[in-house]
């Protein structure tokens, strides 16, 4: 822990929070491992239920955007961050039971995460939003259209596993959908994303100039976090780039060499 003072927030900066290991239990009998990061001294005003990129291409609960969200958002914006490994996925936290099922049985994983957040107490996890990245956006669109969530924030959505029927379901629900689409994405770029997401009248597509699928680089990471906060806590932000108080430092995990679909 570094001494109290003004610290520039960097990729490795870990701000104060209450962090605890959690387990999710799926309807088909699996145990999934995860972590919940909460504001240190206050109850959260919003909750992010994160759905990570494709585990066969390096995605897991520690994928860098989600890891840094858990490092920063509880302290900077009073937002709780729930991260977990989908079935068969491994991180430092451990390995979730089961095996990757190409967005089929992962429906049970999404349901277990939503249920955990919905019924959490001390503190209650209010104002719940899904935050998917790549493969995780497909899981959000396919299985996250649930009355217990306010909406979905989609990072680099490829629209690979999800289909028109899932977009239609979100359209009918009226729940918020916000898609952050990198200008230089490998799978779906902003102009095409606008066309595809027009099936959801309430959806907002935000193109991010210069960004790529993996959101590598502090400027792009900050843009993502600012857009998340603006969505789940309107009128709050942009996030500060310095912190006055104690901080810790974590090892920096390089993004996966494979494209994290």
Residue map of PLM features:
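N-terminal cap/lid segment of alpha/beta-hydrolase-fold proteins
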Residues: 2-42, 46
């Amino acid at each position: 822990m570094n001494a109290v003072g003004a610290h520039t927030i960097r990729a490795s900066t870990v701000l104060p929070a209450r962090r605890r290991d959690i387990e999710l239990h799926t309807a088909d009998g699996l145990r999934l491992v995860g972590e919940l990061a909460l504001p240190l001294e206050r109850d959260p005003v919003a909750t992010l239920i994160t759905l990570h990129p494709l585990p066969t291409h390096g995605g897991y609960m520690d994928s860098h955007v989600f890891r840094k969200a858990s490092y920063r958002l509880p302290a900077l914006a009073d937002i709780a961050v729930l991260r977990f490994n989908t079935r068969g996925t491994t991180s430092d936290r451990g390995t979730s039971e089961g095996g990757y099922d190409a967005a089929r049985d992962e429906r049970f994983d999404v349901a277990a995460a939503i249920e955990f957040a919905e019924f959490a107490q001390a503190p209650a996890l209010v104002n719940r939003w899904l935050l998917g990245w790549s493969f995780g956006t497909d899981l959000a669109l396919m299985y996250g259209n649930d009355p217990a969530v306010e909406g979905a924030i989609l990072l680099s959505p490829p629209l690979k596993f999800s289909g028109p029927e899932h977009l239609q379901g979100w359209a009918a629900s009226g729940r918020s959908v916000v898609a952050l689409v990198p200008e230089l994405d490998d799978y779906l770029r902003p102009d095409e994303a606008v066309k595809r997401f027009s099936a959801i009248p309430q959806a907002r597509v935000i193109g991010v100039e210069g960004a790529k699928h993996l959101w590598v680089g502090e400027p792009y990471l900050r843009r993502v976090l600012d857009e998340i906060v603006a969505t789940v806590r309107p009128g709050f932000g942009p996030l500060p780039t310095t912190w006055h108080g104690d901080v810790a430092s974590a090892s920096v995990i390089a993004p996966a060499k494979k494209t994290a679909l």
